[in-house]
Structures are given as structure tokens and as C-alpha cells.
């Protein structure tokens, strides 16, 4: 048994087939099959039901994959846990929802690098649910997400900022009433696969507002550009860190009961580098306190 074989077993479970696991692990289908046969021989158990065209994990195989994941996570933590006892250095894999990538995250990372120049931050964009899965699998150290109503049991979170949702409208619109504008103008919808998109849909339903959907987008920049071009109105988060060159659009409050999205830094409770995660959280809080994207002066 080797760590490489355990990683392959985990990949088969996560990817659903030998072929997909081979692609994810950058090896051949035959190599995956051979590694799994070696594990079955060494452990003297049947990991897969091979009566189907694509072998499926048996219940025992699924249990062994879960145990293998814990072993691989502990193995991967050996060096980072030792490094974390000294000066902060090395890579941190940080996930971030796309709405934070043009203000909050770049400002926070630049602040972090001023304090710890031996740290390299590797950013992975994604939706909140995707990033939580990547943290759980050990592919990310932490992520900036829209915190859901309930976090998985093994996760911890650190509050970063509350961002009220507001209406974006073209500057030439005839009214500043968000309810009127939502009913009269085409609606540029925030991606419904995102937690924010689901919050927006729930708020529209609660207020019995029927909108005329014209398009559905994920990025704040793309949505703002469409609104600025006069193609409709949209509901998006009010950024806790303003971008350098905001689009010329109206930003209208949805009122005191408008939805608010909570940005949090989330990580696994057993993360082997707690000091690194804490440093990232502090950098994010510093960026929020600054409130606008402005690259820091290297001289301090």
C-alpha cells in the first residue's frame, strides 16, 4: 500500500469512474485498475463490484476510501504542521467566490504579503458549495464564501463582512424606486446556482415581485457592465471593498428588510496550519476596514 494508491482510491470515489480518476490523477486507466487490484490484494477485501460495466465501490470500499482520506490528510499535514510552528512560509490554497476577486481578496492578499513575504497564495475561484467540497476533500486550506445557513460539522468559520444586497440600475432610469424598476425593466439575474442567487430569488418571492428575466450571469463586473449599457436592472451584493473603477450605475437600497449576505472565511477544524489561516483572516479583516481597493504602499 502506498499514499499514491490511496490518492487514486479517493479519486475513483470522487470522480465516479476509473477513467475520470485516471484523468484527475494524470495516469492511465490501466494504472488505476492495477493500483486498485493491488489494494484489494494487500487488504484482502473487495473494494469494487465489477459486475457492472464501470466498477462501483462496494459499501466496504466506500468505508475504506473515507479511511484513506483521513490517512492522506494526515500525511499531507506532516510538513505544513511543522512549518506552521515557525515563521509563516510556503503555499496556501485559498478559495474565493468570484464577487470577492476584484476588491476584497486582492487587497487582503497584498496586505498578507507585506507581512509575510515568504507566503505564496494560490487562488481558486468557485461557488460557495463547490469551495466547501474542495475544503472538505483537502484540496483547499480555506475559502472566502457566502456562508450558508448551516456549515458542515467539521468546518469552522470566521466572520469577515456583511454585504447588503442592493439594486443596480442604469443612470438614465426614470425612478429610484427599486420595486418599480424591478417590475418595469428587464432583470439581469445573479446566477441561481450561487448562494447569493438563491437569496435574491427567495427575496423576490417573499415580496411577490415578478421579474422579466433577460439573462443570468455570475460575475459582478459582467452584471454591472450590462446594467451600465442600459440592458436592465439587477440585484447584487454591495461590496465591502469597493473596486477602483466602478461602473456608472445607480445603486439603490432594497429597504430595511433587504437580504444581506455574510462573507466568511471557512476551513476544516483539523487544518494543520491554523496560524496561516488566522493570518489570512486578519488580512481580510484589514481589507474590509480599508474599504476600497488601493494597492498598499510597499514602504508601509
Model-derived regions, located:
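Beta-alpha-beta core module
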Residues: 152-158, 162-163, 221-270
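Central regulatory/effector-binding core of bacterial HTH transcription factors
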Residues: 89-151
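Secondary-structure junction motif
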Residues: 183-207, 273-281, 287-297
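Alpha-helical linker/hinge and terminal dimerization helices associated
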Residues: 42-43, 64-86
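A short LG(V/I)-centered, amphipathic sequence patch enriched
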Residues: 40-57
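Flexible hinge/capping segments at coil-to-helix
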Residues: 154-192
Amino acid at each position: 500500500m502506498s499514499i499514491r494508491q490511496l490518492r487514486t482510491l479517493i479519486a475513483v470515489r470522487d470522480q465516479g469512474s476509473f477513467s475520470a480518476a485516471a484523468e484527475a490523477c494524470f495516469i492511465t486507466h490501466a494504472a488505476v485498475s492495477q493500483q486498485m487490484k493491488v489494494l484489494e490484494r494487500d487488504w484482502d477485501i473487495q473494494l469494487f463490484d465489477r459486475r457492472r460495466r464501470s466498477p462501483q465501490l462496494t459499501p466496504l470500499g466506500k468505508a475504506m476510501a473515507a479511511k484513506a482520506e483521513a490517512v492522506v490528510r494526515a500525511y499531507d499535514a506532516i510538513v505544513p504542521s511543522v512549518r506552521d510552528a515557525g515563521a509563516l512560509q510556503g503555499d496556501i490554497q485559498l478559495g474565493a467566490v468570484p464577487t470577492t476577486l476584484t476588491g476584497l481578496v486582492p487587497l487582503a492578499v497584498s496586505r498578507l504579503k507585506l507581512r509575510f513575504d515568504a507566503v505564496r497564495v494560490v487562488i481558486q475561484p468557485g461557488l460557495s458549495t463547490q469551495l466547501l467540497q474542495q475544503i472538505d476533500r483537502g484540496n483547499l486550506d480555506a475559502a472566502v464564501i457566502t456562508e450558508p445557513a448551516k456549515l458542515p460539522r467539521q468546518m469552522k468559520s470566521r466572520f469577515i463582512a456583511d454585504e447588503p444586497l442592493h439594486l443596480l440600475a442604469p443612470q438614465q432610469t426614470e425612478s429610484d424606486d427599486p420595486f418599480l424598476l424591478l417590475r418595469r425593466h428587464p432583470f439581469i439575474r445573479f446566477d441561481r446556482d450561487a448562494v447569493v442567487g438563491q437569496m435574491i430569488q427567495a427575496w423576490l418571492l417573499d415580496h411577490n415581485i415578478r421579474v422579466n428575466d433577460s439573462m443570468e450571469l455570475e460575475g459582478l463586473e459582467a452584471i454591472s457592465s450590462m446594467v451600465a449599457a442600459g440592458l436592465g436592472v439587477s440585484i447584487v451584493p454591495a461590496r465591502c471593498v469597493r473596486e477602483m473603477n466602478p461602473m456608472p450605475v445607480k445603486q439603490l437600497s432594497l429597504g430595511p428588510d433587504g437580504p444581506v449576505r455574510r462573507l466568511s472565511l471557512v476551513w476544516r477544524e483539523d487544518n494543520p496550519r491554523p496560524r496561516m489561516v488566522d493570518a489570512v483572516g486578519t488580512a481580510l479583516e484589514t481589507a474590509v476596514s480599508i474599504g476600497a481597493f488601493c494597492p498598499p504602499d510597499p514602504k508601509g
